[in-house]
A protein has these predicted regions:
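Acidic/histidine-rich helix-loop elements
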Residues: 25-37, 94, 165-170, 176, ...
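Sec-dependent N-terminal signal peptides
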Residues: 2-13
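C-terminal domain-boundary segment and adjacent tail
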Residues: 50-51, 150, 204, 214-295
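Catalytic domains of cell-wall/extracellular-matrix polysaccharide-remodeling enzymes
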Residues: 64-68, 88-235, 241
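N-terminal processing/targeting junctions
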Residues: 12-15, 129
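Active-site beta->alpha N-cap acidic-glycine motif
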Residues: 15-125, 210, 228, 244
Length: 295
């Protein structure tokens, strides 16, 4: 059963709004059930049927820098979606010069594709190991006309996808419904938490950015997820509208590892006490929840 979060902020003006963002496109790895072409087509079909515009963040690994991969990315732009930069090699940001070069190589990969948009998604949401590296990359983004595509609703779709693919390889006829139900509940709870945090931080409804991945799980269940979000009061808008929210004009003032954008701002402003929940700790919690659910 979902955990509903009650807050006294529900009278704030505006609708609860989010945009869908997909990392790691076009993801040409082999998976059970669906080919890379079928997964890409299924994602685009779900978005078209639900009349939702999204953005896919591309890199060159896993087949992205191949004729087939570029065609898959081009299909997103041709369908009216945006194509952003996720670096070429999906490197962890440990050193500025190397990371900057990989960012520029990622830009070269997508430049010229339909839907090309100067939005950048940091791999692993790591914006730099030091203040100097972070500020150096911020300068690079400004010089190249890029905007930081912040995340306010992180999800563990990638972990659920890993578990699903592993189970399908061992048991090809496994029932998918438990994975679908767990996934929808997990994402809806994450969205609820982000909404409450945004209201606390801004005193109004924030236009959120949800992090998803180009993967089998979403190829199978994206339309169900969109319908569940709509049924729970969410309005889905395009990336340009969402990232025009003034919240994204704010800049964090310190190096903050493993925290999404809203959490970082909230902790800096004293809205949230204590240290951020690291991705490693959150990952272990989600793994435990999946095991307890028998998935």
């Amino acid at each position: 059963m979902r955990t509903f979060i009650l807050a006294c902020f529900c009278t704030a003006l505006g609708a609860q709004t989010l945009t869908l963002t997909f990392d790691d496109g076009p993801n040409r790895v082999k998976t059970p059930r669906l080919s890379p072409e079928d997964r890409n087509a299924a994602l685009l079909s779900a978005l078209e049927k639900e009349k939702v515009q999204a953005i896919v963040f591309a890199n060159g690994i896993d087949g992205g820098d191949t004729p087939e991969g570029r065609a898959a990315l081009g299909a997103w732009g041709q369908a009216g979606h945006l194509v952003g930069n996720h670096t070429y090699s999906h490197l962890r940001f440990t050193e500025l010069a190397t990371f900057r070069q990989d960012f520029l190589r990622g830009d070269s990969l997508i430049k010229g594709l339909p839907g090309y948009a100067r939005f950048f998604r940091f791999p692993y949401l790591k914006e730099g190991p030091t203040l100097e590296a972070r500020d150096g990359m911020r300068k690079t983004l400004a010089e190249t006309g890029y905007r930081n595509a912040h995340v306010t609703i992180p999800t563990f779709d990638w972990l659920i996808d890993e578990r699903l693919r592993s189970r399908l390889k061992a048991h090809p006829l496994v029932e998918l419904e438990p994975y679908r139900a767990y996934y929808l509940e997990s994402v809806l709870n994450q969205a609820d938490r982000a909404r409450v945090l945004g209201l606390k931080l801004a005193g109004r409804e924030v236009k959120h950015a949800m992090l998803l991945h180009h993967c089998l799980l979403n190829a199978l269940f994206l339309r169900d997820l969109i319908q569940a979000l709509k049924a729970n009061g969410w309005t889905l808008v395009g990336p340009l509208e969402a990232y025009d929210d003034p919240i994204y004009q704010q800049a964090t003032t310190r190096v903050e590892t493993d925290a999404n954008f809203l959490e970082t701002l909230a902790r800096e402003k004293g809205v949230l006490p204590g240290a951020a929940l690291g991705l490693d700790e959150a990952y272990e919690r989600e793994k435990t929840a999946l095991r307890e659910a028998g998935l």
